[in-house]
A protein has these predicted regions:
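Cyclic nucleotide-binding regulatory module and flanking cytosolic helices
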Residues: 2-59, 103-105, 110
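Cyclic nucleotide-binding regulatory domains
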Residues: 37, 46, 62-122
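Short aromatic/basic micro-patch
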Residues: 55, 74, 98, 127, ...
């Protein structure tokens, strides 16, 4: 689904129609297929799904959806990563999640988007109009079951996030985040213990309900204890997973 691409979108404009649609054989070669809802689709339905898909390429910082605007589409991420967030009336931002290849966006929305989504890095998504996509889902039991599973997973993740924000200390929050993140980025396999951090420190802070200074201070403390090392700003190595797990569970 990612062989054809669109021109990069302007950061303040939501994406509109693509000139071309991908062919079904692009779905067969899509690197994110095994990670996404597409993995449940039979060959005949995969052809139909490919016919519905529009491929959109986003540059870093480009807007995919904006909170409060009409929501005619759902999206399947095939490469890159997104930050999903809501804005408070005073302008403060709460990031509610980071999405990676294989994630599906827009399952539980109504007529308007209840969140904004922006690309953290160069990102490609397959975009589907909700009406035709729902019709396909209703005719494909495996796809329907997969989407139900994804929705249940999102609810469980939301409950875990409430616990993280409501009860955990700063070091417990960051340790939990570092343990959880690699499992959400399966399209980017790394060596054991390596964690890819495409997001900025401020974005991590907005996700964990902390300040940038607190995130930096906790990371420095973890490095001093030998729990982690950081070859670069976007690459972290967990040197002591046992201690990281202990901090995440509040045992230290």
């Amino acid at each position: 689904m990612i062989a054809l691409t669109k021109p990069t979108l302007a950061p303040r404009s939501p994406p509109h129609g693509c000139v071309d649609r991908p062919k079904a054989n692009d779905c067969d070669s899509c690197g994110a297929r095994a990670l996404s809802v597409c993995s449940s689709v039979a060959d005949i339905d995969l052809v139909r799904l490919g016919d519905l898909a529009e491929v959109v390429k986003l540059s870093a910082g480009a807007v995919l959806t904006r909170e409060g605007e009409p929501a005619p589409h759902v999206f399947n991420i095939t490469s890159g990563s997104l930050r999903v967030y809501k804005l408070l009336p005073d302008g403060r931002r709460q990031i509610t999640g980071f999405l990676f290849a294989g994630d599906f966006l827009g399952l539980a929305i109504g007529e308007s988007y209840v969140f904004s989504a922006e690309a953290i890095e160069t990102t490609t998504v397959c975009r589907f109009r909700k009406g035709p996509f729902r019709a396909l889902v209703e005719s494909s039991s495996p796809l329907e079951h997969m989407l139900l599973h994804r929705t249940s997973h999102e609810l469980a993740a939301a409950q875990n996030q409430m616990l993280l924000l409501g009860r955990k200390t700063a070091i417990e929050r960051l340790a939990s985040f570092l343990l959880d993140l690699p499992g959400h980025d399966p399209a980017r396999p790394t060596a054991p213990g390596h964690v890819r951090l495409p997001m900025k420190r401020g974005e991590i802070a907005d996700y964990l309900g902390l300040t940038i200074e607190t995130v930096s201070r906790v990371l420095t403390r973890m490095k001093a204890k030998g729990i982690i090392s950081m070859p670069s700003q976007s690459d972290l190595i967990v040197e002591r997973p046992d201690l990281l797990r202990a901090h995440a569970s509040g045992e230290v």
